[in-house]
């Protein structure tokens, strides 16, 4: 058990042993791309499916319309673009993704934003290896990265084109998200007996505001959603590294954890998406599909209903009144949210040779 905990927490040791000294500035520039069957109208697609490679700088994004008919394909020169472990981030008409880079190097050192109207890409250079996730608020962009037992919270001021770093020694920064007032960091560290977990809250000067011990709640937070000044964060493992299925409800005005919801007899939470006053939750089980479940959670009263799904959901996205999901076999499903989640259509998506499907976005 101890070895498994240590292996999972030490994943962020990937990358170069010694980082080159690089001038710590952010550079934004436009990158060219190739398009097959282009039709760059913003309203011609419902979801985008991202395929990528771990061994070469190749990725492609396939755009499907609301009937799951392929509209266009755009190719980009990135390795490990996107992941189903973290959600794509959205701001205005842009999707923000992490291209981690080839193999164990993970040295791409950048965030990309893709304009949903033009499909053009802008790169935001970040002087860090092994970037895990990105968060975007009104003015600031934040990334978490991990290297050689040190985690870094990196801030980019999109107005003044400046950056600020905060290092966390012997800690693993699993999730960062931000509002216009605060930055929220979920951090894990390993002691001799269990995984110690905290929620560290900072202002935008990266000055500490509050530190909440969440060890007894659990760890491995990777996703979140915000609804009416509250954040909803899934918890996948307990302090002893056992799978659990919990949901933290955090008040973003008071910075107090208001509630912890437990989902009994379910696998860990794989995906969450917000639809109107509901949170749609997939409980993933790659081993046994009959244990895969789906929860419809009412955000106004915390009541929920869990049903069997028989689909190992890998990624989810909402567009208009439809839910799109991708399973572990790369089948794309469209469900009608106005008709009791009726299955409307199912198609097979085939990634190019030597690529894999990393995630979907709306």
Regions found by a protein language model. Give the residues of each.
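An edge-strand/N-cap motif at the start of beta-rich repeat modules
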Residues: 38-76
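Structural motif
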Residues: 55-63, 104-112, 149-154, 192-200, ...
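Acidic, serine/threonine- and glycine-rich low-complexity intrinsically disordered segments
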Residues: 170-275, 279, 283-287
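Repeated scaffold domains used in trafficking and secretory/extracellular systems
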Residues: 80-91, 128-138, 170-180, 216-227, ...
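A short beta-strand motif characteristic of beta-propeller blades
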Residues: 69-79, 119-126, 161-168, 207-214, ...
């Amino acid at each position: 058990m101890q070895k498994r905990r240590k292996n999972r927490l030490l994943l962020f040791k990937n990358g170069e042993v010694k980082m080159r000294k690089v001038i710590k500035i952010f550079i934004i520039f436009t990158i060219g791309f190739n398009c097959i069957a282009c039709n760059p109208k913003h309203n011609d697609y419902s979801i985008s499916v991202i395929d990528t490679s771990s061994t070469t700088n190749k990725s492609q994004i396939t755009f499907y319309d609301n009937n799951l008919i392929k509209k266009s394909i755009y190719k980009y020169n990135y390795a490990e673009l996107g992941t189903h472990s973290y959600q794509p981030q959205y701001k205005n008409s842009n999707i923000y993704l992490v291209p981690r880079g080839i193999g164990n190097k993970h040295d791409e050192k950048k965030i990309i934003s893709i304009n949903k109207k033009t499909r053009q890409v802008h790169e935001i250079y970040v002087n860090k290896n092994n970037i895990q996730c990105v968060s975007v608020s009104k003015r600031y962009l934040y990334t978490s990265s991990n290297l050689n037992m040190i985690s870094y919270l990196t801030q980019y001021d999109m107005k003044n084109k400046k950056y600020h770093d905060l290092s966390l020694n012997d800690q693993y920064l699993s999730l960062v998200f931000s509002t216009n007032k605060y930055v929220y960091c979920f951090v894990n560290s390993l002691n001799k007996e269990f995984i110690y977990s905290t929620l560290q809250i900072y202002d935008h000067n990266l000055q500490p505001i509050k530190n909440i011990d969440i060890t007894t709640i659990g760890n491995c937070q990777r996703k979140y959603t915000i609804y009416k000044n509250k954040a909803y964060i899934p918890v996948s493992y307990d302090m002893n590294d056992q799978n659990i299925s919990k949901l933290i409800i955090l008040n973003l005005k008071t910075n107090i954890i208001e509630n912890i919801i437990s989902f009994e007899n379910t696998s860990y939470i794989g995906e969450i998406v917000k639809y109107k006053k509901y949170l749609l939750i997939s409980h993933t089980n790659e081993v046994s599909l009959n244990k895969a479940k789906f929860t419809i959670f009412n955000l106004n009263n915390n009541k929920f209903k869990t049903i069997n799904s028989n689909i190992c959901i890998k990624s989810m996205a909402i567009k208009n009144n439809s839910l799109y999901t991708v399973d572990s076999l790369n089948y794309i499903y469209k469900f009608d949210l106005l008709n009791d989640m009726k299955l409307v259509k199912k198609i097979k998506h085939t990634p190019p040779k030597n690529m894999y499907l990393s995630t979907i976005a709306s």
